[in-house]
Amino acid sequence: MEQGVVEELIHLQLPEVEAVDVVNVPDGNGDGDGDGDGDGNDAWERQLDEVQMQAMRLENPQVAMLLDAPHEPPIELHHMLEPVNVPQRPRKKRSFLTISKPFHVQPERCALISNGWRAVQCVQPEKRGEYFANYLIKHMNSRNYPNGEGLPNRWGQF
């Protein structure tokens, strides 16, 4: 005698719900599929859990909305496991003729320092420091620079 799935409606009284319709009820041997492997009990429990969840969703729409919501943010671990090899952009080759060179600006100097520097150029290199100091002392007077005109008015001009 072939045992198959018995399809009949059974009304179960649950405390949360008035009546529940269940399909694929297990027959005499304990599982509903008739092959004797025993996985029918798990299916029966899963079906009851689904029925109870459906009843809870109907009673409480906020819970249903939370249960149906997707995971935020989506979990995608395979992107984090391996580094992504992005081909590098080839560097632009530049001609040495088109590369601009910095323009060297002469520092801002007052007239006294400029004149002293010009006067020092004709002196031997080992005596230039002493000559420059003597030049500043000799020429920094009111006759050469009346009312302080041409003298440094701030530290940056030295």
Swiss-Prot record:
Residues 30-42 have a biased composition (Acidic residues). It comes from the Eukaryota. GO terms for biological process: sperm individualization. Pfam families: SOTI (PF17079). Keywords: Developmental protein, Differentiation, Spermatogenesis. InterPro entries: Soti. This is Male-specific protein scotti.
